[in-house]
């Protein structure tokens, strides 16, 4: 048995960890710490947070040699080994370790050593000397008070742990125990509403997939803070971060925008229990946590999940059809406004996620396409195409259900290209042209044609960038809006340019990311958005800005905005209702 004992030192943000194991022969043990965490596809080099490390065997100091950035070899000596190390933990995220006097959290991958060749041995986790009053929330199987045990290392690191003062909201979905564990500081909110809405989302997803569910219990670890957002999936739980203002207030009718975003996060990470934690690329079966695990299939595992996360909010009726279409229009608009969609394919976006998407820079809108956003639109088109071509006999639901049955039977990952093959086998349709176009070219998807089959009309309009897309209205501006051609962050006394968009007004004026605009037409730039809202296409703005501490001046002529704002109109409410219900 391998034992991991953790002791917190909250004020220093240190986890003091002891790895204990028996070495039965005179051979070195090889210890490895993960370089990345499943579900977050970039190298994070967790070993850099190790502050000190030493070893002893049979109670005596023993040699421990580092042989790579995340690898250590013990001396070739049989006996009872203890490797003691300290890890700095101050990463406020869902994928690492965090420790203060108020709260602790960790994803086991970033703290716990694996012993090479012994991944399938029983692992015990012990939490010692926790601060008084701290509670523990995790789906790790408990064998005692703050003592947990798993059958393998892979299972050990797939149950994040939340520590501190925790509020719990429990419910059942399809007879399975579920719990929302809330941490952080947050205002009073409608607890019954949150519990009820999340329960409906879970029940809708459980009803979509065949039994048995991939978990016997499920835990949402929800940490609330200020302007934070994110989620990471695990086999029977998920770690979530959300803004404290996103909790449903008392008396709320239709879910507001912030609450809808929170419910979408719950939905997205829960869906991953089937799509990526169960059904997964062969490249992830098993995960190699030493190096990048490249696959062209992230569009199917993240993009399809991103399609269903909001769709299932509508299907479970926690948001209205109109609010769902507003979310869909915003997603279409985000994709349309990124010129990267014309340069990078979905397959390339998936494969290069490790060093491009997760390391996006100021040129990202011009060079990259998101396998989340574009992938969700490919899933939308695929779903509606299957429904139409099969006369309603099949849908993307059918494909996802059968892929899960496949996994229940084989427990194997999906090889490159196999997802597309199985989709066609399951539906009996020839979808080869769609997959070739959608995955391996930058040709636009014919979404307008596709959405008509669901009773929706898609129209693009040249609206200001402040309009992110939504439900259409009867009247549109008579002339296209002007477009500044840059993204910016407004500060108290200047606007900081963050992205310059190819072919736009700002690029033509030779502005650069990082420029600080201090004046427009000789007036202080305290509200650039307001200045642009009052301008018209063809207006020339005199811009004064700082670049690397040097004052510059340029003239910027506002070009016409592209028709890239998506507006959706309901033309057949019956068709729309049947699609959202999954019965079209």
Regions found by a protein language model. Give the residues of each.
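Non-catalytic architectural context of zinc metalloproteases
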Residues: 45-52, 56, 60-200, 204-215, ...
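Early extracytoplasmic/domain-onset interaction patches
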Residues: 1-35
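C-terminal recognition in membrane/secretory proteostasis and scaffolding
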Residues: 309, 319-584
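Post-HExxH zinc-binding segment in Zn-dependent metallohydrolases
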Residues: 238-245, 278-279, 290-341, 550
């Amino acid at each position: 048995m391998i034992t991991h004992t953790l002791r917190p030192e909250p004020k220093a943000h240190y986890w003091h960890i002891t790895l204990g194991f028996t070495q039965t022969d005179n051979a070195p043990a090889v210890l490895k710490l993960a370089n990345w965490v499943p579900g977050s596809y970039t190298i994070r080099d967790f070993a850099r947070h190790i502050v000190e490390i030493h070893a002893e065997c049979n109670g005596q100091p023993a040699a421990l040699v580092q042989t790579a950035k995340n690898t250590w070899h013990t001396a070739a000596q049989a006996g009872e080994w203890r490797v003691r190390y300290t890890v700095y933990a101050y990463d406020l995220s869902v994928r690492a370790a965090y420790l203060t006097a108020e709260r602790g959290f960790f994803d086991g991958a970033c703290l716990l050593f694996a012993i090479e060749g012994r991944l399938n041995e029983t692992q015990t986790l012990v939490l010692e000397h926790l601060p008084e009053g701290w509670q523990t929330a995790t789906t790790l199987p408990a064998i005692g008070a703050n003592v947990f045990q798993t059958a393998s290392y892979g299972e050990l690191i797939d149950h994040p742990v939340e520590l501190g003062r925790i509020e719990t909201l429990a419910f059942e979905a399809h007879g399975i125990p579920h719990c929302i564990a809330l941490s952080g500081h947050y205002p009073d909110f409608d607890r019954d509403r949150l519990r009820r809405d999340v329960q409906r989302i879970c029940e809708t997803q459980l009803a979509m997939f065949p039994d048995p569910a991939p978990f016997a219990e499920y835990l949402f670890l929800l940490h609330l803070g200020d302007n934070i957002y994110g989620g990471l999936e695990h086999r029977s739980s998920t770690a979530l971060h959300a803004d404290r203002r996103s909790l449903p207030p008392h008396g709320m009718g239709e879910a507001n925008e912030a609450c809808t975003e929170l419910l979408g996060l719950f939905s997205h990470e829960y869906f991953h229990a089937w799509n990526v934690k169960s059904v997964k690329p062969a490249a992830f079966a098993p995960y190699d946590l030493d190096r990048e695990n490249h696959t062209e299939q992230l569009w199917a595992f993240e993009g399809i999940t991103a399609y269903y996360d909001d769709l299932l909010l509508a299907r479970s009726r926690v948001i209205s059809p109109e609010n769902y279409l507003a979310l869909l229009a915003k997603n279409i608009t985000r994709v349309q406004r990124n010129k990267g969609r014309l340069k990078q394919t979905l397959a390339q976006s998936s494969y290069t996620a490790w060093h491009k998407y997760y390391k996006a820079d100021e040129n990202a809108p011009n060079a990259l396409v998101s396998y989340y956003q574009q992938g969700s639109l490919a899933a939308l088109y695929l779903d509606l195409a299957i429904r139409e071509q099969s006369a309603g006999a099949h849908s993307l639901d059918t494909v996802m259900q059968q892929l899960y049955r496949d996994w229940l039977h084989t427990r194997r990952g999906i090889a490159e290209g196999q997802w597309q093959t199985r989709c066609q086998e399951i539906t009996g349709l020839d979808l080869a042209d769609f997959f070739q176009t959608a995955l391996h070219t930058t040709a636009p998807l014919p979404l307008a044609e596709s959405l008509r089959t669901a009773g929706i009309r898609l129209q693009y309009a040249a609206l200001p960038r402040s309009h992110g897309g939504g439900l259409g209205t009867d009247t549109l501006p008579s002339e296209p809006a002007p477009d500044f051609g840059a993204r910016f962050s407004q500060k108290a006394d200047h606007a900081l340019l963050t992205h310059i968009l190819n072919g736009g007004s700002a690029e033509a004026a030779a502005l650069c990311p990082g420029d600080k605009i201090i004046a427009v037409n000789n007036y202080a730039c305290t509200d650039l958005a307001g200045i642009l809202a009052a301008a018209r296409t063809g207006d020339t703005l005199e811009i004064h800005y700082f670049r690397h501490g040097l004052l510059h001046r340029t003239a910027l002529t506002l070009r016409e905005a592209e028709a890239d704002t998506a507006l959706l109109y309901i033309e057949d409410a019956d068709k729309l209702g049947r699609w959202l219900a999954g019965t079209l």
